[in-house]
């Protein structure tokens, strides 16, 4: 950007083009980034064909493989953590919390905070079709698409399935074959059958498309 020097703005960074600014400690060039990797990464795989988002800031982990612990709501997952039912190495799956399933794609902060409180933040992973915020700590994957409410693979995962997250390979996979389970899946009853949230659930697009309504 550029501001005209006669517009009342003194000679500062704001009055010059970015190419003329030599002290680049804040806005770095591609050749000299602040860190070698960004704060988030997009993964794809058999568990997230349309993609998902993993937060990398705040930890150095890039790989995790473990048995799935499946929960159909944030509340059920939170209770399991509080009751001591989650073990080191587990991959916690929280589903039906996406844009359509929630509805609204609420934040899974309570579960991640509980995991940190139980001392499990560095030894488990969490995968959800819900979302996270900047306050989240640990190896967390959100925005899984397609979401469970739309019949995405995350809806077919069962307790004990082996789930593998590999940030370097940009993959999120489940080892088991989901095909035979497809015919057994039935969409759950909607949480709202009337009102604004019911309408929203019917209209909202996938998280991979911005969760917009048409």
Regions found by a protein language model. Give the residues of each.
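Acidic, glycine-rich flexible loop/linker segments
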Residues: 92, 131-214
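Structural motif
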Residues: 19, 39-42, 53, 62, ...
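Generic long, charged, amphipathic alpha-helical segments
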Residues: 79-81, 88, 103-111, 115-143, ...
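Phosphate-interacting basic helix/loop segments used at nucleotide- and nucleic-acid interfaces
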Residues: 23-24, 73-81
């Amino acid at each position: 950007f550029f501001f005209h020097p006669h517009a009342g703005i003194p000679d500062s960074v704001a009055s010059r083009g970015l190419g003329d600014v030599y002290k680049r400690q804040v806005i770095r060039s591609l050749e000299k980034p602040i860190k070698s990797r960004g704060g988030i990464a997009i993964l794809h795989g058999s568990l997230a064909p349309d993609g998902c988002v993993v937060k990398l800031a705040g930890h150095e982990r890039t790989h995790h493989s473990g048995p799935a612990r499946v929960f159909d709501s944030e509340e059920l997952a939170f209770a399991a953590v509080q009751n001591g039912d989650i073990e080191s190495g587990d991959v916690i799956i929280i589903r039906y919390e996406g844009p359509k399933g929630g509805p609204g794609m609420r934040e899974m902060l309570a579960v991640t905070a509980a995991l940190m409180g139980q001392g499990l933040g560095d030894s488990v992973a969490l995968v959800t079709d819900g979302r996270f915020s900047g306050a989240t700590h640990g190896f967390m994957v959100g925005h899984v698409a397609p979401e469970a409410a739309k019949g995405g693979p995350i809806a077919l995962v069962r307790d004990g399935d082996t789930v593998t997250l590999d940030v370097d390979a940009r993959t999120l996979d489940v080892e088991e074959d989901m095909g035979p389970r497809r015919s057994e899946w039935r969409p759950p009853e909607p949480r709202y059958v009337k009102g604004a949230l019911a309408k929203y659930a019917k209209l909202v697009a996938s998280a991979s498309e911005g969760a917009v309504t048409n």
